[in-house]
A protein has these predicted regions:
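Acidic carboxylate diad motif detector
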Residues: 61-167
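Gly/serine-rich nucleotide phosphate-binding loop at the start of the catalytic core
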Residues: 2-84
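Substrate-contacting helices/loops that form the catalytic groove of nucleic-acid
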Residues: 49-73, 158-163, 169-306, 373-382
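Glycine/proline-rich, flexible active-site/cofactor-binding loop segments
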Residues: 119-181, 187, 303-307, 311-315, ...
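Stable alpha-helical structural segments in soluble proteins, enriched in small hydrophobic residues
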Residues: 42, 87-98, 360-370
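Short acidic-glycine loop/turn motifs at beta-strand connectors
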Residues: 21, 135, 169-170, 206-209, ...
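Positively charged, low-complexity nucleic-acid-binding target-recognition regions
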Residues: 2-9, 295-296, 300-382
């Protein structure tokens, strides 16, 4: 049986750099700190209410107390009401996810308090922000309670802006607009493809195409270790330690940006060139339990690759299908017989005479599973 997930209204995110003044940057940092404290208080209140009184609080219970919060703690009057509401929604979402994991029998992971520096964004869900040009023709982002901030709109925003999120990444500030957009259909190619993701090669396609694994984290590992060792030698609380921590964070940011750029480009190629894209429905959480492969799997970011391909396919009118990964590498794509092979064996050789790369063999099997009636486990598309 197949489960079909329909996306009626695609959402698209636009991210831009903003350039606050020193005073504005301090206000943004203070806003993040106030949001962090509120988030932690919301978690603590829920914890106490349940332990002492057996009461499960929800978002609405806590949102009703925001007015009293502002009266008691005057600095919260400096924050837009919807920003505060969004903080409580995040806390509520954390508990919803916790209960969902408990229901599924997964490792629950009770919602955690956010330490300093670990709450890096706040959101205006519906109002409190606007875009405009000043008298000199420069672009500005007006934020309620903060003022006009310089922004660089390097590309045109399409669709209707639904939310505005301000995010701090190390020493830089960004804004991310979540927009409701009309699907932009791409021309049909009448082609389907199976995709087998891996570590040796990032991906093998059923048409024989191989995508190299860039291994961005591995390439930066030596430099990262060097800077982390320097960080460990710095005195806690010192300015030199803060500066060194920023250096380490910048390396991580560069790796993250390189990886995301690669994933966007490769997923875009798939959606442009194929109408139907079939992936394995991999359980990444279980796979990273193998400590020898965990870092390489995380560096490859297979889940994010599938996620990017899926939302691009939704907007383009294409289809993404997920199939059971069981034995896709062991079954011969030519005759259907099982040919056992170890991970070290990179070539598929079958008594039927078929000889080809094991990953391409798997990709062909993945395509067959995805396009056979009733064999797919999940489908995403329009």
């Amino acid at each position: 049986l197949r489960t079909i997930v329909w996306y009626n209204i695609p959402m698209k995110a636009y991210k831009y750099r903003i350039y606050p003044t020193k005073k504005q940057a301090q206000t943004l940092a203070n806003t993040l700190e106030s949001c962090r404290v509120l988030y932690n208080c919301a978690l603590e209140q829920r914890k106490i209410a349940y332990k002492q009184f057996g009461i499960s609080l929800n978002y609405y219970h806590q949102a009703d107390e925001l007015k009293d919060l502002k009266e008691t703690f005057a600095h919260y009057k400096q924050l837009h009401s919807q920003v505060l509401q969004d903080v409580l929604k995040r806390a509520d979402k954390a508990f919803q996810n916790f209960f969902h994991r408990v229901k599924l029998g997964d490792k629950p992971g009770y919602p955690r308090f956010k330490g300093k520096g670990w709450y890096d964004s706040f959101t205006y869900p519906q109002s409190g922000f606007s875009l405009s040009d000043n008298s000199k023709g420069n672009q500005r982002l007006k934020l309620s309670k903060i003022g006009e901030v310089k922004i660089k709109l390097h590309r045109v925003i399409k669709g209707t802006i639904k939310t505005c999120t301000i995010k701090r990444e190390v020493d830089k500030w960004y804004v991310c607009f979540s927009c409701e957009v009309e699907p932009e259909r791409l021309p049909k190619t009448n082609k389907s493809v199976g995709v087998d993701v891996g570590l040796e090669k990032f991906a093998a396609l059923s048409d024989g195409t191989m995508v190299e694994n860039p291994r961005y984290l591995r390439k930066s590992e030596a430099k990262l270790k060097h800077e982390q060792r320097k960080l460990s030698r710095k005195k806690k609380g010192s300015n030199s330690r803060k500066k060194q921590r920023t250096k380490v964070a910048k390396i991580h940011r560069k790796v993250k940006n390189q990886r995301n750029d690669f994933l966007h480009k490769e997923s875009c190629k798939l959606v442009t060139n194929y109408d139907v894209i079939v992936f394995e429905d991999l359980r990444i959480k279980n796979m990273v339990k193998n400590h020898r492969l965990a870092k390489s799997i995380s560096d490859a970011s297979w889940s994010k690759f599938v996620e990017y391909a899926t939302y691009k396919a939704v907007s383009a009118g294409k289809e993404v299908i997920l199939v059971n990964p069981r034995n896709t590498s062991q079954i011969c794509s030519g005759c259907g017989n099982t040919v056992k092979k170890s991970l070290a064996a990179r070539t598929h050789k079958c008594p039927c005479g078929l000889v080809l790369d094991r990953d391409i063999n798997a990709a062909i099997n993945i395509l067959r599973l995805g396009t056979s009636p009733g064999r797919a486990t999940a489908v995403a598309g329009l």
